[in-house]
Amino acid sequence: MSLFFLSSDEFSKFVGKKLALTEEIYKKLKSKSFLIDHDSAHLDVLASRYWTKKSFLREFVKLHIFVLTLRCNSSCTYCQVTRQAESANKKIYDMSEETARRSVEIMMKGPAKNITVEFQGGEPLLNFNVLREVVLYTESLNGEHHKNISFVVCTNLSVLTDEMLFFFKEHNINVSTSVDGPRDLHDYNRCRKIKSARYDVVVKNIRRAQEALGRHCVSALMTTTRESFQYPREIIDEYIKLDLGSVFVRSLNPYGYAVKTQNSIGYSPEEFFLFYRRVLDYVIELNRRGIGFAEATAAMLFRKILTPWPIGFVDLQSPTGNGFAVTVYNYDGDVYASDESRMLNEMGDARFRLGSVYEDSYETIYFGQAMQLLAATGVAECLAGCVDCAYVPYCGADPVRHYATQKDAYGNRVASEFCKKYSLIISYLFEILRNADAETENIIWSWLNDAPVDRFEIDMEKEICRLE
């Protein structure tokens, strides 16, 4: 998308339709498709940009999540899954090989040529044999389907072995883990009762994975609790010390154990934003010192603001990515529209259950009532409170979250914490863009191009034109 700032007087003339056709501002707004006249060529350009922005819909589901087990050897205070103890019955809480194979067969019937297979839990490495079966069976079927397939395992790394690392290397499997910050904060958030995934273990195994797989194959995210508010700089310093190139500053989700602990570790959207702003300011400061490092939420939103390209983050997609961009295959064979849909089911509400790999075909899974509900409630451009919002091109609908918090998949934006959080963040990103000097612009573009800051000496206007 184009970037163009107006003064208050200029904006008033623009929305009041009082700009003269000969004014330079009129010409510039037209050239950037903020207004159109009877020149159909500009409408064609705008249509092309819009189609590109929504191109994540072309291939349908590209992210396939396999929940290998509900068993876990950690005790995170904010766990959004109804986890089970590591000693729990494997026959009940682990995905079987038969379930895995049926899930893979459903996945491979989809039209997408580029797919990501993501392994989750619980702690997915507690069921490593089935992880291996999913990878090998997927690769065997792909001889016929010719898809581009990537794999990632989301793990606390506590049970990582050399055998696993060898398999990951052999099959190009990336690792995503969790680091909440320095030792005391990480262990406070994630290891109060069970110490298996304590800081020292995670750090040691991050370094093992980086050495075995390569730095670019290991990523991490952090989850924000009230305790995190004290350590915005220390959290980022920890990521840099671990040679992790970016951080995803994640807020709490309204599912699982996180609901029960909300009073002790939770916060308002406004409180989260104040923390997030301190983190982002520090990240930009570090980049100014020549330390290349990105914050994932800002990078995704800048991509939506500054380029015509889509993003793969389900929460910020419209039409919703729930069911249309992601599918979850649960340990028991049930299929869900998203990870959040699966978590909602663990809390006793199966509204967004799509079907079962044992009972349903590809067609009945994706054309059932749950998908119809998601289609009806998942287009932000058509929802009350979104349709007239200036930020709707950069936001998402997320009907599952709104149903979880409001018991209404359409959602009331006035009462929506999702809406409040992203409105605050997007407003701040526009403030950064408005005040950006050349160095800040280079930093932002380095995030979008995933390259070192010092490689970029970019004129933002020219770069936007190139991308469009």
Task: Kindly label every feature range from the protein language model.
Residues 80-85, 215, 390-394:
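Detector for the c-type heme attachment site
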Residues 58-60, 65-95:
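Canonical Radical SAM [4Fe-4S] cluster-binding loop centered on the CxxxCxxC motif
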Residues 1-28:
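Short amphipathic alpha-helical interface segments
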Residues 189-200, 207, 211-323, 328, ...:
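Radical SAM enzyme [4Fe-4S]-AdoMet core and its adjacent flexible, acidic
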Residues 100-118, 127-254, 258, 264, ...:
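Radical SAM/AdoMet-radical enzyme domain recognition
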Residues 345-468:
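Flexible mid-to-C-terminal extensions adjoining Fe-S/redox cofactors in radical SAM and related proteins
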Residues 3-4, 24-65, 83:
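N-terminal [4Fe-4S]-dependent radical SAM core
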Residues 68-75, 123-126, 386-388, 392-393:
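Cysteine-centered iron-sulfur cluster-binding motifs in ferredoxin-type domains/subunits
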